Structures are given as structure tokens and as C-alpha cells.
Amino acid sequence: MTIRKAEEKDIPRIIELLGQVLQIHADIRPDIFIPNTTKYTVEELTELLKNKEKPIYVAVNESDVCVGYAFCQLQKQPFSNNMVQFKTLFIDDLCVDQQARGQHIGESLFEHVKKEARKMNCYEVTLNVWSGKTSAEKFYEKMGMKTKERQMEYILDNL
């Protein structure tokens, strides 16, 4: 397995994996996510691949077929009176093909993101994860991540 930056030839496979992730989210929160959709279109992914501030890394097998990805965003904390200035590499989405799980591909992708973040002189790697005792939460904790802040919600029942 190799990890590299995503290329246009990876887009069809990335779309498939985006569908897998969306279905997991729709199962957890059917009140928010629409099943059988994806976060990005082919056109949006084509444009995203050109954005150096939003790198996409893919894990590919021996046949150069994408079996996982990490969508990232370089974020800069601007200077303010109460916070120091720093850079973060935010993992917007990380997925391993459901048929390839258990082969440490997710760990390899996560380690690659950390390595790239260091090259970019980032202070931290961050991400959001849906709560509910999911396998994703367990995975990120295993990778050494800790809760930094927590977003809470109150669903209004008058909708």
C-alpha cells in the first residue's frame, strides 16, 4: 500500500468511498444526512484537487486503486488578544473502504497526515467526529487523539 496525493484518476473511486461514509452518517443521524448521496460531485472534487490548502491523500493498493482517503484543510488561527497564532491541519473526512478495513490503512493515512502537518509547521491535527460510541471515535482515540472541545445541540421539536 502507498499513500500519495489524490489525482483526477482517483475521483470515481473517491466518490464510491464518499458514498460509504455518507451511509454511515445517515445511519447515525437520519435526521440530518440524506442517504444515497455524496458530499462532493465529480466537478467539485476536480476543483478541490487543485486547492493546495485542502490536500486529499489517498491510500492505494498494489494495483493503484484507492482503498482509503483523508480530506484535509490547512487552517490558520489568526492572532488575537487572547490566542497565539498557529496552523492546524484539519481532517475533514477520513475513510477506508469497508472491504479493506482491519488492514491498518486508516492508521497509515492518519500517520501520513501527521507527517504532512509537521512539514507544514502545523501545531496540531484536528477533526470532528460524530458521537455515539462509534468505531470512528474508538479509532481516533486509539490514534492518540483527545477531545479538545465539544459541540452540543438541542433539537427543537417544532419543525
Model-derived regions: residue spans:
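Conserved GNAT-fold acetyl-CoA-binding loop/helix
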Residues: 23-45
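Conserved GNAT acetyl-CoA-binding A-motif
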Residues: 117-128
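Conserved beta-strand in the GNAT
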Residues: 58, 65-74, 95
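Conserved acetyl-CoA binding element of GNAT-fold acetyltransferases
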Residues: 82-98, 153
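Conserved acetyl-CoA-binding loop-helix of GNAT-fold acetyltransferases
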Residues: 93-96, 102-115, 142
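Conserved active-site alpha-helix within GNAT-family acetyltransferase domains
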Residues: 107, 111, 119, 131-149
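A short helix-loop-beta-strand connector motif used in the catalytic cores of GNAT acetyltransferases and
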Residues: 43-58
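A short beta-loop-alpha structural element at the N-terminal edge
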Residues: 2-16
